[in-house]
Structure formats: C-alpha cells, structure tokens
Amino acid sequence: MKHLDNLIDDLKKILGENLVTVMIFGSQAHVEPEKLKSNINLMIILEYLSSDDLKNTSKVLQKWVKAENPIPVIMSKAEWYSSFDVYALEYSDIKEKYKIVYGQDLTGDINVDKHYLRLQCESELKNLFLKYRNHYLMKINSDREMEKVANNVIKTLLVIFRGVIRLHNELVPESSEYIILQAAKFMEIDTELLIRMANVRDGKEDYKSKEIRK
C-alpha cells in the first residue's frame, strides 16, 4: 500500500533509530499488501517517546488519518512491556493477529495473565452496558443513530467474546458468527440477535424500519 510505505518512510526520516516497530493489528493484519486500502490499525513503538516526537510526527499521522485510517497507537518500548496487565484483551488480539511492517517483532514477549484478561472482560462488559443505556436514551428516536450504536456494541462484544474464548483455552474462530456461537458455550447470550447484529455491521443484512429501536 502506497500510503503505508510513504508513512513508514516519513517516520524513519523523522524518528531515525528511535523508531523500533511499526505493526498492523486487527482484521487487516492478514490482508495481502496490495489489497490494503484504508481502515488500517497501526501500532508505532519508539525506543523513547517525548512530546517532541508527538509534535514532529503529528503532520504525517494526520495525513494518515485523513486517508480513512484510525489514529495509530503510539507508545514507548517501556510502555509496551508494562501494559500487558492493563490491556490484556488488546494484547491477546495482537498476539494472535498482527503483521510487522517495519522493525523489531516484540510480540514474542507478550505474556497475558488470565487473571487480568478475565478482569478486563468483566470491566468492558459492564462499561458497555452503561454506555449503551445512555446512548439508547439519547438516540432512540433515530434509526440511523441507533444503528451506529448497535454496530459499536457488537464490535466491542466481539472483542470481549474473543477474550472469553481464550480464557477457556480454545482457538478463536475467524468469522463473527462462529465467535458468537463459540462464546455461547461459556455465556448466556442471544446468539440469533447477536449474529444478526454482526451481519448488519458487516453489510450482509439490513435492519427493518424501527427494528433497531426495540
């Protein structure tokens, strides 16, 4: 992908030897390079991270975001190694699905304690319920806004479900449908509803008029 190659070249020029790693994580990590177009999650790891580094890279990263990509995660090497407990869900996902596009591969050192993974699953689920209730109150009269809320809900639930599956030492399926079905072995969830929500988010189905408000 030209945009990605250009970004890496710019980061190398700006950061020099301070740039340790650039990696793709998430759903795009296993996509062939020529098919990468947008919505690419990047993690940028530096040996040391200062306010000057943020300032100096802001312009090229803003350009990257304007090309319809999420804001990259940027951190120091020390932060990377000290965050396995706080971001247990995220590191579990990264370890399973990533691609190094520049520099060192630090993922072999990822060690996620199941205690912290369980705690984050519980915390994220409770926070999701609270946020959803608030959004429901504020967006209930708009099908379009409620669909956005539902898409965000299922996106977060799938992350949590992957964590739950890993807690039980099972492999995480690729498709949203099978992730939901696998998680249902360990949780009481409405698989039919959740699969429908996932299909709508993935563009496979559409909600009927006012269905999203129920």
Predicted regions and their residues:
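Residues that form or immediately flank small-molecule/cofactor binding pockets and catalytic motifs
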Residues: 27, 77-79, 199-202
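Active-site palm subdomain of RNA-directed nucleic acid polymerases
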Residues: 15, 19
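Metal-dependent nucleotidyltransferase catalytic core
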Residues: 1-14, 30-37, 42-87
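Conserved NTP/Mg2+-binding pocket subregion across the NTase superfamily
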Residues: 54, 58-148
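Short gly/ser-rich loop at a beta-strand->alpha-helix junction or flexible surface loop bordering the NTP-binding
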Residues: 20-28
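Conserved nucleotidyltransferase catalytic core and NTase-mimicking acidic/glycine-rich helix/loop elements
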Residues: 4, 111, 115-214
